[in-house]
Amino acid sequence: MEKAVILGSLARSFPTDTLDKFRSIKGVIDADLLFGPYDFYVVAQAEEKVKLDEIALKIRFTEGVASTTTCNVVNKETLNLVRAHTWE
């Protein structure tokens, strides 16, 4: 299972239903507004990376979204590869 956290900025006059639009996207498991350098975060989950990319693009092109940064969560398989690697 692939997972990502999408951080984003909204246009100054963003629609009040933007979070509802995010939450209606299949694969979005959480979304909320933030204070700080980003205006919102979305947590998304999908079986394949390509589906996760599709979710990120849907969020990026939602009306009122000015920019996004997608952070892929390191899954257990990748973490095990990192742990097994010897850094010489």
Identify the residue ranges that each predicted region occupies.
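A compositional/biophysical signature of low hydrophobicity enriched in polar/charged and small residues
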Residues: 1-88
